[in-house]
Amino acid sequence: MARDATKLEATVAKLKKHWAESAPRDMRAAFSADPGRFGRYSLCLDDLLFDWSKCRVNDETMALLKELAVAADVEGRRAAMFAGEHINNTEDRVVLHVALRDTSSKEVLVDGHNVLPDVKHVLDRMAAFADGIRSGALKGATGRKITDIVNIGIGGSDLGPVMATLALAPYHDGPRAHFVSNIDGAHIADTLSPLDPASTLIIVASKTFTTIETMTNAQTARKWVADTLGEAAVGAHFAAVSTALDKVAAFGIPEDRVFGFWDWVGGRYSVWSAIGLPVMIAVGPDNFRKFLAGAHAMDVHFRDAPLEKNLPVMLGLIGYWHRAICGYGSRAIIPYDQRLSRLPAYLQQLDMESNGKSVTLDGKPVSGPTGPVVWGEPGTNGQHAFFQLLHQGTDTIPLEFIVAAKGHEPTLDHQHEMLMANCLAQSEALMKGRTLDEARAQLQAKNLPASQVERIAPHRVFSGNRPSLTLIHDMLDPYALGRLIALYEHRVFVEAQIFGINAFDQWGVELGKELATELLPVVSGKEGASGRDASTQGLVAHLHARRKA
């Protein structure tokens, strides 16, 4: 069936009425009255558990949300994506990052062409190159083994590889990995200063080889190599992830060190492609393939499972409920895993660049809110930074906890137990809160004077009823990481279909880039600022004055 706008509008109205009149208000009471609540509002895929029972939903909520998914034709749009239809309508492109990790299909067609042999060819070339670097068969220009790799990229060419490389630190047995993204010269200067060009490989990741930040940093790195080792050494110390073979050749990188990908792979969905080359070099081709296999397992589940048993669908529906019905404008991602420290930033781009839209697929203004602000930090660090606001602030911010049952350090298992206890405690505290009577009783137990009890007790009240969901897997390994990232990719897709927007373009990135190009000669003093707004003129004048001071 196609998207049913009339039914969708009616279901949204029913959900809003339900939220106002009959959604759970007291989560303590909801759990007391329903011992089976956890079982009904949780799902498993193998060892991966998704629990949303602490969210303010009941059976009526879930029935209406499923009705919403049907009206939005989530299943039809899902099928269209997997079938290679041009669902990115503003750029007339198919959306097939799922093909990058497809190990079970015989063919995946893009405009009649089976792309799986192409995907396999690039993956095999990546593996051969990675093995060569890791083993020392591919050496630097002076014959030294490569000990460090520096990936230069930005956005999807940086966030995914950084996140995955940090997450898979226990599997690193290759060269050390470093990442440069910011055009701020401090970033590349600080990265290169402790390294030796003779044992460093630099990967330049830019599909067009024109991205300003990436190419500026790449030229700086090229000069660093050439000034030390000579111009002829450049080719032995660079590789590229790009489709612009002419520009790559002009830069001095041989074609056998260039790895391409396709326009049906969006930047924020590209870590599975050649963009993941630094990850593969760090952890090895076998572990990278396990990373792909985990994502593929989630793809198959998302494609085949019925709506009510489908983890990405249910995660997306809860996300929509929180954003569009409950009115929560923010979403906190809190992985209780230090190695997932960059996951919030990765999901921030994935979600906000995909669903930060204000017009529908047909170019009309949306009728309600779309994607939330996504942010976060690892636990337990966040508890000592911003959890005060999450517990007692005036805004309700849903939290998404992620934790593993087992850590990688058996001799430090007691610390992992403390980590898990903190994660579950925060989830419980947000839900239960603490009443005024409970706060008084706690203070009275300390034998404080009655006047002091009455003065302090209100400050120790927690409202509770603050929603959170929890994801638990056995251990953060390559397979589990791939599965987790694919879960969030498909969740974003589900929410976009209900919002009625295109999750696969990012026109909001363009205007600032265009104006930066115009302003560069103004900031550098080659052109005047006349014709620009008074604020920009004033800022330019101040910068000029301070640079001369």
Curated annotation (Swiss-Prot):
Gene coding for it: pgi
Protein name (record): Glucose-6-phosphate isomerase
PANTHER family in alphabetical order: GLUCOSE-6-PHOSPHATE ISOMERASE
Keyword list, A-Z: Cytoplasm, Gluconeogenesis, Glycolysis, Isomerase
Species classification: Bacteria, Pseudomonadati, Pseudomonadota, Alphaproteobacteria, Hyphomicrobiales
Pathway: Carbohydrate biosynthesis; gluconeogenesis; Carbohydrate degradation; glycolysis; D-glyceraldehyde 3-phosphate and glycerone phosphate from D-glucose: step 2/4
Catalytic site positions: 353 (proton donor), 384, 513
HAMAP family tied to this protein: G6P_isomerase
Provenance organism: Brucella suis (strain ATCC 23445 / NCTC 10510)
GO molecular function per UniProt: carbohydrate derivative binding; glucose-6-phosphate isomerase activity; monosaccharide binding
SUPFAM superfamilies reported in the protein's UniProt record: SIS domain (SSF53697)
Broad enzyme group: isomerase
Domain of life: Bacteria
EC number(s) recorded for this UniProt protein: 5.3.1.9
Predominant localisation class: cytoplasm
Summary of the function given for this chain in its UniProt record: Catalyzes the reversible isomerization of glucose-6-phosphate to fructose-6-phosphate.
NCBIfam families in the cross-refs: PRK00179.1
Similarity field: Belongs to the GPI family.
UniProt-listed GO biological process terms: gluconeogenesis; glucose 6-phosphate metabolic process; glycolytic process
